[in-house]
Curated annotation (Swiss-Prot):
Catalytic activity: a ubiquinone + n Na(+)(in) + NADH + H(+) = a ubiquinol + n Na(+)(out) + NAD(+)
Protein's recorded name: Na(+)-translocating NADH-quinone reductase subunit A
Keywords: Ion transport, NAD, Sodium, Sodium transport, Translocase, Transport, Ubiquinone
Protein family membership: Belongs to the NqrA family.
Superkingdom of the organism of origin: Bacteria
Gene: nqrA
Lineage: Bacteria, Pseudomonadati, Pseudomonadota, Gammaproteobacteria, Pasteurellales
An example molecular function term from Gene Ontology annotations: oxidoreductase activity, acting on NAD(P)H, quinone or similar compound as acceptor
UniProt xrefs under Pfam families: NQRA_2nd, NQRA_N, NQRA_SLBB
Subunit structure: Composed of six subunits; NqrA, NqrB, NqrC, NqrD, NqrE and NqrF.
Gene Ontology biological process terms from the UniProt entry: sodium ion transport
Amino acid sequence: MITIKKGLDLPIAGKPEQVIHNGNAVKEVALLGEEYVGMRPSMKVREGDVVKKGQVLFEDKKNPGIVFTAPASGTVTAINRGAKRVLQSVVIKVEGNEQITFTQYNEDELKKLTSEQVRQNLQSSGLWTALRTRPFSKVPASDAVPSSIFVNAMDTNPLSANPEIVLKEHWQDFTDGLTVLSRLHEGKLHLCKAGDSNIPTIDLPNLAVHDFSGPHPAGLSGTHIHFIDPVSATKSVWYLNYQDVIAIGKLFTTGEIYTDRVVSLAGPQVKNPRLIRTQLGANLSHLTENELSAGENRVISGSVLSGNTAIGPYNYLGRYALQVSVIAEGREKEFLGWIMPGKNKFSITRTVLGHFSSKLFNFTSAVNGGHRAMVPIGAYERVVPLDIIPTLLLRDLASGDTDSAQALGCLELDEEDLALCTFVCPGKNEYGPMLRAALDKIEKEG
């Protein structure tokens, strides 16, 4: 058992009921291009094309053989692009049930798969994109070999679903997926789960099971990798979430891609917070219809700490998102708010009365202050359990000193690993974009 002591479980209202319900009907789905770091698409479809589920929509020019497939059958209604023609989203109006099938194996054959067979099926189906590398959080190259693979079967994000509830419906598919991943390479396959959970395992020669406990970020893959198999400039690992392991198991046993998702629909502005069954890339306006309290709301694909605002061409459930979080837009100004006792405000420091309360808070998007310089008062050290010096690292990220940032461990991190630092920052700094800029520069220049 690895126990995390530093961190923060955000006391946010609107926690979901841990029972799975059917969500609203999905009429539109999309793939979001900007989720795939460094990807340059070569489009294989046009607006108006009719596509089958599993059909290739685009391929990565930088990574030949890595394809991105349709999560549903229907008609391509929009290919949205932003500045410099960056791909924002490929939108499909869901129609029919036609799909492309892939190679199918029985239970005995799974244990004898070769690495080449696993790669071929994952890459041709588009499920290879479930894997991400650390460092850089990119889809791995088609011929890359990791030091190890991490399966994340726990979630400590605010308002998250309990993976054990989701996995109960798919025990066999999950263990089949683990078997397939164990055949992908000869290194270790690390299954990380909560210490008090009852997650199924299977007897595999290279499978190692690890228990974690403690506050968020105990459930992040970056935390698991840091304590078990740290990365460097010359060493990489891959990671994926438990629902993608289910999808991999189903792909190899049925020959069909599985795009169902169970996500938590939760937050202070959700009328009935609960777990809902929906589809990868679902339109979040449709999914949240008649589910939200009145007023101006911010719908987030992912966690309230590190998710993406679902608006315009990005109004869809992300490829790696297991949550839909909803908070109110905090546009109101509070007169002399800095001098008030703040019994309805939360802070990690003892500056408001809410710090001493055990109640849940209706957080909004308001940052309660303007941008200012970093103030090293020990807030970052309280929420970062990794063996790094957060204040110095964040200073280097803010100043663009990538050499020092690399020496201090930035290659181990992803945006979600610094989300708590952003939340507790007295200077209202956004450290995720700073980290991404540093990682891009390091990858390009070394």
